[in-house]
């Protein structure tokens, strides 16, 4: 696919992809509460869609793979009247330990990035609280995002609405100080999917991780395990980056 190289083309692609709003997150439910005011979308010029978490009125946190590998990225939300809005990115910081080939090579990677927007978000968006809590196996967290509810759909119409789902923390490879693994305790195939990367994973009222990856049964890519990068262990890097931008994250 040819890369799109202008905001106009990005807007046209967005209009086609999101012409018919649909649900997001496999097996999730619409989330219209506080969490929805702390999240928005990231669009890439290669057609990629991700979710991002608001840290300040012009700063977002997302997965590193959402803002690397293409020439253009935009933050997206819908105005009160439903009009699509695209915001340009002024700066981005990718975690120094991010490895784009980590999945294929099974190397360690911290799939995390921060982006600063060229203009502030509307007042209806509020900064999320990041949490250092170390949720362990058996704990229940909420995963949310703008991703697809049907991974077989290639039109983009099965994504674009903010949904959330409760999942159980699992430790298939033992405790991890970097990653958080989640599974549907009811074995109904619920979880994150394409478009949910960078979205919040919440315990209580704090974001403990950002979605980064999913697996599925058989030929599917979603519905088995959902993975996130923990934000607590990366606090030093997050705080230092935001300080350089004259911003501060909220922690609990």
What label would you give each PLM region?
Residues 1-9:
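Bacterial N-terminal signal peptides that target proteins for export
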Residues 9-17:
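Bacterial N-terminal signal peptides
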Residues 19-21:
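N-terminal signal peptide c-region/cleavage motif recognized by signal peptidases
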Residues 32, 38, 48-49, 54-68, ...:
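C-terminal subregion of chymotrypsin/trypsin-like serine protease catalytic domains
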Residues 40-43, 71-84, 139-145:
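Short conserved beta-strand and strand-loop elements enriched in small hydrophobics
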Residues 108-112, 117-189, 224-225, 231-240, ...:
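Chymotrypsin/trypsin-fold serine protease catalytic domain
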